[in-house]
């Protein structure tokens, strides 16, 4: 009887020990899931989405997330700088020719009317030849600044060549022809009256509306034709096609 009692007591202790072990394993599993597995699942999902990692879970994982997030932010900032440099002209910080070639066709395919304005600096070669390239660069930067001031923040302003610029005025129809004429007149006057420290500068401007009544060619060619007409008749002025 005594041996049997001892055996039962040992058996109960083993049973209790196994039960406690199972409970501990379950608790450990839950803790592991909360502190390790679940955060890792969230981390992986964040990486797939391209989002910063959530700072959660075990301290080691939180530290890892913070390090990864710092690297993520640095990469995002670097990509933003690279994208800006790829899309903008380094001298003027206007959008560049590549951006024009990407944005202009999108506007042409859309249903919202817009205006294309082409701008050339008059006698730019002679400025470069007589005053040097530094003066030429200053002239380009000044025109770029005046273009940004003359048009709205929602419009796209580009430097598309050495002394050539373009502006896409969004959501503008031919019904606004007179206000655009006034804007271009003021622009030409502003440029002509602000050549302090530089030789006299003037610009020739040609424009066309996407909804013009009697197009002769593509929008770009019709705006370019208007610009050519200005150059043929003395420069330092503007013309809207049609």
Identify the meaning behind each predicted range.
Residues 57-64, 136, 177, 216:
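The cytosolic transmitter module of two-component sensor histidine kinases
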Residues 157, 204-212, 218-233, 239-242:
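Cyclic nucleotide signaling catalytic output domains
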Residues 159-160, 175-177, 188-204, 231, ...:
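Catalytic core regions of nucleotide second-messenger enzymes
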């Amino acid at each position: 009887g005594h041996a049997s009692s001892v055996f039962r007591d040992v058996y109960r202790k083993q049973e209790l020990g196994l039960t406690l072990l199972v409970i501990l394993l379950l608790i450990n599993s839950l803790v592991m899931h909360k502190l390790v597995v679940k955060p890792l699942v969230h981390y992986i999902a964040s990486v797939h989405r391209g989002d910063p990692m959530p700072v959660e879970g075990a301290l080691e994982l939180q530290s890892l997330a913070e390090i990864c997030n710092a690297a993520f932010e640095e990469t995002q900032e670097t990509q933003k700088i690279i994208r800006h440099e790829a899309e903008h002209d380094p001298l003027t910080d206007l959008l560049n020719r590549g951006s024009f070639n990407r944005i202009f066709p999108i506007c042409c395919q859309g249903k919202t009317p817009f205006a294309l304005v082409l701008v050339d600096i008059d006698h730019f070669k002679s400025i470069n030849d007589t005053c040097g390239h530094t003066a030429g660069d200053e002239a380009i930067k000044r025109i770029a600044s005046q273009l940004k001031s003359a048009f709205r923040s929602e419009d796209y302003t580009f430097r598309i060549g050495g002394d050539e610029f373009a502006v896409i005025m969004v959501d503008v129809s031919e019904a606004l022809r007179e206000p655009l004429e006034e804007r271009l007149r003021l622009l030409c006057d502003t440029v002509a009256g602000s050549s302090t420290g530089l030789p006299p500068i003037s610009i020739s401007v040609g424009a066309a509306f996407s909804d013009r009544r009697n197009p002769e060619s593509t929008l770009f060619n019709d705006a370019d034709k208007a610009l050519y007409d200005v150059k043929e008749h003395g420069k330092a002025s503007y013309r809207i096609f049609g």
